[in-house]
Amino acid sequence: VCISINEVVCHGIPDDGKLLKDGDIVNIDVTVIKDDFHGDTSKMFIVGKPTILGERLCRITQESLYLALKMVKPGINLRAIGAAIQKYVEAEGFSVVREYCGHGIGRGFHEEPQVLHYDSPETNVVLKPGMTFTIEPMVNAGKKEIRSMKDGWTVKTKDRSLSAQYEHTIVVTDNGCEILTLRKDDAIPAII
């Protein structure tokens, strides 16, 4: 479990001594292994009364994930999905982190392909039924640049702006995808 608060982009280390305050945005990222297969998901939570920026950032990040999920089907290039996420996020005045991405997942936690959340000519993977991977855009309220902390694990926004992330593990079906990590409060069907 990673718990990332406010400007922590990813890999936040849980800390019993850290008190949350009104308006904090918190990402909880959970990985499970069941029957030798991995699953990976994350979700944002807002503590108490949300700030306008915090609520908007979380909403736009989740919407960018849903937009991407609705695009998944055989024959689609992952580049188109990354480009759509980037276009949507940047049109809202936010930025997409470049150093971290979604990933293939199965018996191994990080497998091919890499799933970039921005447009890159180096992405040339065409989706096929049975492919299983995560989509997990990390979106910053400020600039896209990040920095690693001295603990060698935690990553924060360089400009100390807020960061949000939503993630699902999916499998490509014959005509769309199935969300393997769907939550009861998700506003999207399990099978798209």
Mark where each language-model region is.
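Active-site neighborhoods and metal-handling regions in enzymes and metal-associated proteins
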Residues: 1-192
